[in-house]
Structures are given as structure tokens and as C-alpha cells.
Amino acid sequence: WSSDVCSSDLNGNTETKYCEVGDQVRVVAAQAPEGKKFSHWTVNEKPICYNESYTFTVYKDIAVTSVYVEEAEEIQKEVSVLCDVSYANGRVKFLSKYSVPTDADYKVIKAGVVATDSTGYAAIQEVQQELTLDTTATTRLKKYGVNTDLYLANFTQYLKTSRTTTWYARGYVTYQDNSGEQHTVYSDMAQYTIR
């Protein structure tokens, strides 16, 4: 399996690297032009890292973009989560990538993936719920997670199956803010159909 990784800088220059799935890639932001400063990296247009260098594991074709803002602009850092579902060799792979700002006085508690098959997802939609850890509309929920204190990491879970269905998943990260309140942030929905 090979994959394309595209990174671009402020001047519109795009660099494409061809990598193997599973390779680790490091991107470093170009020097900001006068009057600008580096803000963050996005993966497929979602903020994922606020450091000028970002190392990640390639899991599919992705676009990694450096974002620059005006020098005087305050950078608004946010918690972000991405999710991907794939299938190979009789196993569904759920992958969640998350990033929690290190300077926001947050404490990371747990990260993982919540998933269900097409039967479970239909039940969730029927009662107009969302796929979350608190979903009550189906017993077909798969909740995977690990207690962690990492601010930028991947979480991967495999499920052995060959049944024809569509798997739906959302990555999540749970953190505690500086007032002691816990929050869980979810990715957009990812899905993969086994045929």
C-alpha cells in the first residue's frame, strides 16, 4: 500500500511525498513571511498540531497544510479529533488521531473510538441520537479507549470480522479543563463498507 502526503506552505507551494502506509513522516513549517506567524497544521482542513514541526503516521492519502496568521492575531487553539475506518485481512481498523493544546492547562484523561455497524447506526438515526459514548439507542455499540496523558497521539483498535456491513465510527478525547470540568470532543463520522 502506498499513500500520498501533500503539504503546502503560505506561498501556495505544495510538496507531495509518496509513502508507504505505516511510515512516519515529519513536516516542518516554512519560515513565515514578514508580518505573519505560524499558527498550526491542518490535516484534511482540521487543525491537528500547533507546533512548527509535526510528525505523524501515514494511514491513507492526506493533505497536511501549514497555516499562518497575521503577527498581531491571537492564535485560538482548540481540541481536535480525526477518525478513519479501513478494512484489510479480515479486520476493521479504527484509527483516531487527537490533539489537545499543551498550554491550555488541560489534563488529558482518555482517548479512543466509539463504533457501530449499519444495524446499530440505523437504530441511532431512528431516534435522532448521535454516535457517542452515551448513545442508548443500540446495544451494538463498540466502545474502545485507553486512559492516557498524551496531548498528541493516535489510538488504533482492530475488530476481526468479515460480515458484509458498514462500520461507523467517531474518535474521541476526554480532557479536564482548569476548573476541573470534564469534556469529550468527538471527530466527524467516519465509515467503511465491507463488501
Tell where the protein language model's regions lie, with residue ranges.
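Short, small-residue-biased leader/transition segments that mark boundaries at the very start
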Residues: 1-7
